[in-house]
Regions:
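Nucleic-acid substrate recognition interfaces
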Residues: 1-385
């Protein structure tokens, strides 16, 4: 079994320059391969990885592209393999048509393969192709490294994601089973009686984020107009490209740091909650939510996107696979909130999200909306085991 582990690396200036150059080269090769396949497709011809790989070989011999020799050759080939995989997913209707990669995307990455032990850990350093030994922060022991993805974030931090061999040990058997109903106010309510409040990290940082984003927008608008207004006076500003304006780039980094903090807080929360549920329960029953459909509700879309249900469910699923637990899913349109968990009566009035408590007209049971839904989800899940 394989898993990905992420560590921060601290390349020196020459290593940073080479990483950035490799990112640019991989993007160039990917885009050239995509353009070649697109043109062939438009002309009724079908080409694949073999033809684009031959194109790369030709470019390396061209003096105009001499800089390709400085980049990791395996990473260049891998960018074409990734392109080929993207086309295969497209033709199987598992994804959209591949898009060209932009140098303006602030998060960039490339992937390289471990061949002949050219990727290995030595003390506080990791050896990477072309880069040599790069200082990194290892926080856990890992198995054999299969491949590595080198990432540069929007805040100019560098990371490696190592795909490693992993042999998980199954957790001790427990008789505990649990059903959970996810929500926006409470992240989830469980049949155990536990409820976890939605931390709302985005909402808590929204005021500061909006302020810094407005500040960045004003700086960009002033730069484009060529003038900066102070009071009643207008002052000319530099005519450098945006990428060379240090103050604008500093402000962009401020905005990116806020986004990064929100992402890190959310990921930490999701990891801890998913691990807790996996450790304590043998069977976990969840809803098979159509999140993309729920996002069509524009009033709730921002909150639904922020709460990250899909990511949480994904974590539960792969951790259950690792540690010998069982995840069951109630069907997408199962009316878990409307059904009485005691007698099975379906109360369509409960479709109204404002109704948080209700009394079953059939058996008289008083229900908390979310707890009742969690019980129904568990019962449905157990029936599917």
């Amino acid at each position: 079994m394989n898993k990905g582990v992420k560590f921060r690396i601290y390349p020196n200036k020459s290593q940073q320059s080479l990483i950035n150059q490799t990112l640019g080269c991989c993007r160039l090769i990917y885009n050239k391969g995509l353009a070649m396949r697109k043109d062939s497709f438009d002309n009724g011809l079908k080409i694949g990885y073999k033809e684009t790989s031959a194109m790369l070989t030709g470019l390396k011999k061209d003096n105009e592209y001499f800089f390709l020799k400085d980049a990791d050759s395996i990473a260049l080939q891998q960018s074409l393999r990734d392109l080929d995989s993207a086309f295969k997913r497209f033709f199987k209707k598992l994804g959209g048509y591949p898009n060209f990669k932009s140098k303006h995307n602030h998060n960039q990455s490339y992937r390289t393969i471990n061949q002949g032990d050219n990727i290995r850990i030595s003390g506080k350093y990791i050896k990477l192709p072309k880069l040599g030994y790069v200082k990194f922060k290892q926080s856990m022991d890992i198995g054999h490294i299969n491949n590595v993805t080198v990432e540069r974030t929007s805040t100019n931090k560098y990371f490696v994601v190592l795909n490693v061999d992993f042999e998980p040990a199954a957790l001790p058997f427990t008789s505990k089973v649990i059903g959970i109903d996810v929500g926006l106010k409470e992240f989830y309510k469980a049949t155990s009686g536990d409820s976890v409040t939605n931390p709302k990290y985005l909402e808590k940082s929204s005021k500061k984020l909006a302020h810094e984003q407005r500040k960045l927008s004003h700086m960009i608008e002033s730069h484009i107009s060529g003038y900066k207004t102070i009071g009643n006076k207008r002052f000319p500003i530099c005519d450098k490209p945006l990428s060379e304006c240090k103050n604008i780039q500093k402000q962009r980094k401020k905005v990116a740091l806020i986004h990064e903090k929100i992402t890190n807080q959310r990921n930490d929360f999701l990891q801890k909650e998913s691990t807790k549920l996996i450790r304590e329960n043998q069977i976990i029953s969840i809803e098979d939510l159509n999140v993309s459909g729920l996002l069509q509700n524009h009033k709730l879309a921002k909150s639904i996107s922020s709460v990250s249900w899909s990511k949480f469910f994904t974590m539960l699923e792969y951790k259950a696979k690792w540690y010998g637990r069982i995840i069951t899913k109630a069907p997408t349109f199962y009316p878990s909130s409307q059904m009485c968990s005691c007698c099975g009566y379906k109360n369509t009035d409960v479709k109204d999200l404002k109704i948080r408590k209700w009394i079953c007209p059939e058996c008289g049971t008083v229900h908390d909306r979310d707890f009742n839904a969690a019980v129904n989800i568990l019962n449905k899940g157990l029936a599917l085991v």
